[in-house]
Amino acid sequence: MKTINKITIAILTLSAAASVNAATTLKMGMQASVGSVEYNSAKMLADTLEEMSQGEIKLALYPSAQLGDDRAMLQQLTLGDLDITYAEFGRMGLWIPRAEAVMLPYVAKDFDHLRRMFESDFGQGVRDEMLQKFNWRALDTWYNGTRETTSNRPLNSIEDFKGLKLRVPNAKQNLNYAKLSGASPTPMSFSEVYLALQTNAVDGQENPLPTIKTMKFYEVQKNLAMTHHIVNDQMVIISESTWQKLSDTDKDIIQKAVQKVGDAHTQTVKTQEAELVSFFKSEGINVTYPDLEPFREAMQPLYKEFDSNIGQPIVSKLAAM
């Protein structure tokens, strides 16, 4: 009997030890598809976490909106049903209106400028509100490309935008960019854009350069204007419910891994953009560099309206950072 009890105790002890030492598996959902830069960086994050934790932290990836769109996944983070996802800093404007300022056309000059906003008192205030109200902890933000404009006619200046039927997503900042630049904003589903460009149902569209290449818009549009109108980022957000369950050691590993992979991701996107301009030129695309100052001037009514709605002069402060 004593022997059986000893064996039972030994088994229970081993089971407890195995439970304590079991790997932590986190779930990360995203809208990006397999093969995209975002997915590849998430895969790199999974590999980096496993390496840095010696196999104790694993990251399971759910790409291609398997878990819903970005709003659905953020809601899952709030409830603690999902651990990690991507979201743009300016996207927080849906819940925290002042955050939208960073995505207004021509407010962010480049990613370094956007990062200064993210790390400023303004950005910290937004992140604090994300945490306190929605259970979202922003670990870092990564560069995800700058939006440029393709068209079926050369765009050498803002004057060339007049009457241009420009496909944009159904988002305020993109609609405002088109309208205030003199174009005719034409919202439509992303999946319909290629055919619409091919048949001249629309005259142009706007997206980051990697998207223009991936979707092969350059096959049906022979003009690319470097309008630099909106800088895209993607925050890596973890559910605070998940964060509080982690040990201090695991938190440190995750934070360092996110920053390490973020640096690589940002550099990859910047390198891609530089190489893609040359690629498009080699494909016979006419690349133009219109003066951006008239575009910024055209956005002034939007900035004034935004500040008025928020009740404070946010835009000018962010633009000056």
UniProtKB/Swiss-Prot annotation:
Single GO cellular component term: outer membrane-bounded periplasmic space
GO-annotated biological processes: transmembrane transport
Signal sequence bounds: 1-22
Source taxon at top rank: Bacteria
Keywords (A to Z) from UniProt: Periplasm, Signal, Sugar transport, Transport
Subcellular location: Periplasm
UniProt cross-references to InterPro entries, sorted A to Z: DctP_fam, TRAP_DctP, TRAP_DctP_sf
Residues passing through the membrane, by range: none
Pfam families for the chain: DctP (PF03480)
Annotated family: Belongs to the bacterial solute-binding protein 7 family.
NCBIfam families the UniProt entry points to: dctP, TRAP_S1
Quaternary structure and partners: The complex comprises the extracytoplasmic solute receptor protein SiaP, and the two transmembrane proteins SiaQ and SiaM.
Task performed by this protein: Part of the tripartite ATP-independent periplasmic (TRAP) transport system SiaPQM that catalyzes unidirectional Na(+)-dependent sialic acid uptake. Binds the common sialic acid N-acetylneuraminic acid (Neu5Ac) with a high affinity.
Entry protein name: Sialic acid-binding periplasmic protein SiaP
Organism: Vibrio cholerae serotype O1 (strain ATCC 39315 / El Tor Inaba N16961)
Taxonomic placement: Bacteria, Pseudomonadati, Pseudomonadota, Gammaproteobacteria, Vibrionales
Name of the gene encoding the protein in the UniProt record: siaP
